[in-house]
Structures are given as structure tokens and as C-alpha cells.
Regions:
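Anionic-ligand binding region
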Residues: 126-141, 149-161
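Ligand-binding beta-strand-loop-alpha-helix segment within the catalytic cores
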Residues: 123
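A glycine-rich beta-to-alpha transition motif near the start of alpha/beta enzyme domains, typified by
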Residues: 1-112, 142, 152-161
């Protein structure tokens, strides 16, 4: 079995190409848990399995966390996957088009080691909440594949020096 390991913004990912279907999808979760196990294997934050596209993309990606659970998509992983597609000649043009359960993710090489991706637009909920004594002025709940929350506090506001 051939695989590649990439690092993006501090996250490590293992990439498997399964374009020929030689690996049964039922094995993906167990492979993720085995390959991503730190200190006893390759070690990674997640496994991305590439399959033939189903809806006009360059490939379809299935993402598995290190414990074998699934996620719709991962932004840092998608950037690594764009690099992989570029380096392996898997993209049909200058833009890499990756099908994910969260929707189509597109990426473009902007420098030798830099890739920019376009994610789905997150949903936004503006709230004023207090969390453990910190008053938050803004909370964004987005789901670009894996649920995320961004909290800006008074400390995050720009200040003049």
C-alpha cells in the first residue's frame, strides 16, 4: 500500500489513493486508526482517501479522524490535498476541484509551497454571551465540514499603541 504524508499549518495527514477500488471502503476507518496512531505507526491527525470523482471534480475525498470517525472535510487537509493533486498531476487544470461530503472544495497553487482553497460559506449566528468570565462580543458558528466556532473578545480588538 502506497501512501503520502503531508503537513499543513501544524496538522499532519496521510493520503491514500484508491482510484482502482483495491481498498474496500469498509476498511477506511480501521486504516485511519492504524495509520494515524502516534508513536506506534505513521502518526497523523487524519486520513484522506482519494476516490474517482462522482460529480465532475478531479477526485472525491473521504476524511477520517485519527480515531477512525468521519468528518465531511478539513480545511488544512484540503490544502494538503490540493498540493498532492498538483504534484501527482491529478488535477485537470490550474485549479484543483475536490468533491467532499461538505460540497466542492476548490484550490489553487499560489506559490511553490502555498495553496489557497475556497470553502463553503459558513452559517453565522451573532450572540452576546459570557463564557467562564470572559464577555464575548461575537460568536461565529460555521460548518465548513467540521464544526468550528470563533470567539472574539475585547482582547482581540485592534488597539492603537
Amino acid at each position: 500500500m502506497h501512501f503520502w504524508k503531508y503537513c499543513g499549518a501544524g496538522n499532519d495527514f496521510v493520503i491514500l489513493e484508491n482510484f482502482d477500488g483495491s481498498i474496500a471502503p469498509e476498511r477506511y476507518a480501521a486504516l485511519a486508526a492504524a495509520l494515524c496512531r502516534e508513536h506506534f505507526s505513521v502518526g497523523a491527525d487524519g486520513l484522506m482517501v482519494l476516490e474517482p470523482p462522482a460529480q465532475g471534480g478531479d477526485c472525491r475525498m473521504r476524511f477520517y479522524n485519527r480515531d477512525g470517525s468521519t468528518a465531511e472535510m478539513c480545511g488544512n487537509g484540503a490544502r494538503c490535498l490540493c498540493r498532492h493533486c498538483h504534484d501527482r498531476g491529478l488535477a485537470s487544470g490550474p485549479v484543483q476541484r475536490i468533491e467532499t461530503p461538505a460540497g466542492l472544495v476548490t484550490g489553487r497553487r499560489i506559490a511553490a509551497d502555498r495553496y489557497r482553497i475556497r470553502l463553503n460559506r459558513p452559517s453565522v449566528v451573532r450572540l452576546h454571551v459570557e463564557a467562564e468570565g470572559v464577555r464575548c462580543a461575537y460568536l461565529e458558528l460555521g460548518e465548513p465540514g467540521i464544526p468550528h466556532a470563533v470567539v472574539l473578545t475585547e482582547l482581540d480588538r485592534p488597539r492603537a499603541e
